Amino acid sequence: MLGPLLVVDDDAAVRGLVVRILRGWGHAAIGEAGSVAEALDYVDTWRPTVVLVDVGLPDGDGFDLSRQLRDKPWEMRIVVFSSDADPANNAAAERAGAIGFFPKDELLSPALQRLIEDRTDDEP
């Protein structure tokens, strides 16, 4: 089982949806943040193993936050997501140090679950 997870999105309804998805996959320790500042506070306190970050945040963007998280002295799996499915977001997420990018309409994808849990296709 993974350690704490963090969902970062300025829309509380989206955060709630992502939390429900993660709980449905068996994850219990899930934090929420609505801004870059809240995310950084959470990260420094709880040291999550996975952070799901929306691109658009009120005090920055998910790519900048991903770069800041990469500077932390422990390993985190960072996934960037957005309602904008522009293919350029994949490359931008990778450059920012994220392990992947998902459009918000694909958040229920088994591929996302495997990615955040660091599993291959043939693992249960």
Task: Give residue spans per PLM region.
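The feature encodes the CheY-like receiver
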Residues: 58
